[in-house]
From Swiss-Prot:
The keyword Amino-acid biosynthesis applies. Residues 392-401 have a biased composition (Gly residues). It is found in: Cytoplasm. Belongs to the class-II aminoacyl-tRNA synthetase family. HisZ subfamily. GO terms for cellular component: cytoplasm. This is ATP phosphoribosyltransferase regulatory subunit. SUPFAM superfamilies: Class II aaRS and biotin synthetases. The lineage of its organism: Bacteria, Pseudomonadati, Pseudomonadota, Gammaproteobacteria, Chromatiales.
Length: 401
C-alpha cells in the first residue's frame, strides 16, 4: 500500500493480514480459550506464559530457517541486542522445560497467547494468530505421541470441530533414506521441496543427478505414492523392506501410533503420507496435521521434535501440537458463546434494592445491562430480551419484551 493511502480518512486501517475480533466472535473465542485450558488441565498439562518478546538468539535457537524469516526483529534500546517478537510459542516452552524447570520426570505444559508473523502462512491467513497448544517433554515412546494426538483431537472436538481428519507422516523415513544415499545438504533440500510438491518428474531428475544407489533411488522415488489409509503402511512395508534400520524403525513407529489411535479413537479418519514433511528442519519423528473438509489448510498440527532441548543444555524428547484459536472459532460447528438477544435491560439507578437485584442476577450468570440516561437505542440494541421492572408492590421482576 502506498504512503498516500494512509490519509487522515483511513488512518484506522490495520496492517495487511492483522486482524481484530468484534462481538460476539471475541466472546466466543474467549469462552473457547477457557474451555481448552480447563481441558488441558484435566489431562495434567500445566499452564506456562512465555514473554511476547525475547532476545533473538534465545528465541530462534534450534528452530531452523522457517521461523527466522517469520520473526519480526528489533533492537533492544537498553542493551543494543537484537530481539524478536515470537512467531511460535513452542520453542519458548521447550526453553522453559529444558532451562527453567529441568525436571527428570515427564513435563506436560500448555500455553495460549498471541504470536506475530512477518508473512501470512497461506491465503487469507492471519499474521497475528492466537496460538494454543500442549507439549509433552521427557518421553520418547509412541505412547506420548498417541497422547498428544488424542489431546489435539479432543481439543478440536471441544472447539466444535466434530469430525477432523488426521494426516500422519514421519520425517525419519525420508531423512534416513537421503542420508543413506549420501545426499549433500543441497541435494536433500532440493529433494525435500520436490517431494512436498509431489513433482515426480523433478524427483527423477534430481535422483539422476545425484547418482544414488538403485535400491535407495527406488525407495525415494516411491515416497510420493505411499499415501492413503492403513493400506499405505502395508505398501510402505513392502517398498522399504530393505531400507536402513532407522527407516524401518520409523515405519514401525508410525504403525505403533496408528494402532494406538485406532484403539482410542476408532471413528477418527486416518490418512498417511510418507512424503508429508512439514517442519522438516524442526521435527525429528512423527508429524501430523488435522484437516476439516471444506477448509483449505490444517486447523491443528504437531509432531515430535526431540533435538530442541539440546541447545538449552538439557536434551529431552518432546512432542506436541498447536492450533490457531481464531481458526478454530472460524471453522467450528458450534454456536456463538453469547447468543444474540439474551440479557436483561435494567434501569439506571443506585437504589440499594435495585443494585442488590442486579448483583443477584449477575451472580446467577445472567447478563444485565443498565440503561444509561438519555441513551439511544432500546433493549434490542443492547442485546436484551427481557427488562427489569418494578411490580405493583415495589419489588423488582424481570419481564419478557
Amino acid at each position: 500500500m502506498s504512503d498516500s493511502a494512509f490519509s487522515k480518512d483511513n488512518r484506522w486501517l490495520l496492517p495487511e493480514g492483522v486482524d481484530e475480533l468484534l462481538p460476539p466472535r471475541a466472546a466466543q473465542m474467549e469462552t473457547l480459550r477457557r474451555q481448552l485450558l480447563d481441558q488441558f488441565g484435566a489431562w495434567g498439562y500445566e499452564l506456562v506464559m512465555p514473554p511476547f518478546i525475547e532476545y533473538l538468539d534465545s528465541l530462534l535457537t534450534g528452530t531452523g530457517h522457517d521461523l527466522d524469516v517469520q520473526t519480526f526483529k528489533l533492537t533492544d534500546q537498553l542493551t543494543g541486542r537484537l530481539m524478536g517478537v515470537r512467531a511460535d510459542i513452542t520453542p519458548q516452552v521447550a526453553r522453559i522445560d529444558a532451562h527453567r524447570l529441568r525436571r527428570e520426570a515427564p513435563s506436560r505444559l500448555c500455553y495460549i497467547g498471541s504470536v506475530l508473523h512477518a508473512r501470512p502462512e497461506g491465503i487469507s491467513r492471519s499474521r497475528n494468530p492466537v496460538q494454543v497448544g500442549a507439549e509433552l517433554f521427557g518421553h520418547a515412546g509412541v505412547e506420548s505421541d498417541i497422547e498428544i494426538i488424542s489431546l489435539a483431537v479432543a481439543s478440536l472436538r471441544t472447539a466444535g470441530v466434530a469430525q477432523p481428519h488426521l494426516d500422519l507422516g514421519h520425517v525419519g523415513i525420508f531423512r534416513g533414506l537421503a542420508r543413506a544415499a549420501g545426499c549433500t545438504p543441497a541435494q536433500e533440500g532440493a529433494l525435500l521441496e520436490a517431494l512436498q510438491r509431489k513433482a515426480v518428474a523433478e524427483i527423477d531428475e534430481l535422483l539422476d543427478e545425484a547418482a544414488i544407489d538403485p535400491h535407495l533411488r527406488r525407495m525415494l522415488r516411491a515416497l510420493p505414492q505411499l499415501n492413503g489409509g492403513l493400506e499405505a503402511l502395508d505398501h510402505a512395508g513392502e517398498v522399504l523392506a530393505e531400507a536402513p534400520q532407522g527407516v524401518r524403525q520409523a515405519l514401525r513407529t508410525l504403525w505403533g501410533v496408528a494402532a494406538g489411535l485406532e484403539r482410542r479413537l476408532p471413528d477418527l479418519p486416518l490418512h498417511f503420507d510418507l512424503a508429508e514433511l512439514r517442519g522438516y528442519g524442526y521435527h525429528t519423528g512423527i508429524v501430523f496435521a488435522a484437516l476439516v473438509p471444506g477448509y483449505g489448510s490444517e486447523v491443528a498440527r504437531g509432531g515430535r521434535y526431540d533435538d530442541i532441548g539440546r541447545v538449552f543444555g538439557n536434551p529431552r524428547p518432546a512432542t506436541g501440537f498447536s492450533a490457531d484459536l481464531r481458526t478454530l472459532v472460524q471453522v467450528a460447528d458450534g454456536q456463538p458463546a453469547v447468543p444474540a438477544g439474551k440479557g436483561v435491560l435494567a434501569p439506571w439507578g443506585d437504589e440499594p434494592d435495585l443494585i442488590k437485584v442486579i448483583e443477584a442476577l449477575r451472580a446467577e450468570g445472567e447478563r444485565v445491562v443498565q440503561e444509561l440516561p438519555g441513551q439511544q437505542g432500546g433493549a434490542a440494541a443492547q442485546g436484551c430480551d427481557r427488562r427489569l421492572q418494578q411490580d405493583d408492590g415495589g419489588g423488582w421482576v424481570t419481564r419478557p419484551l
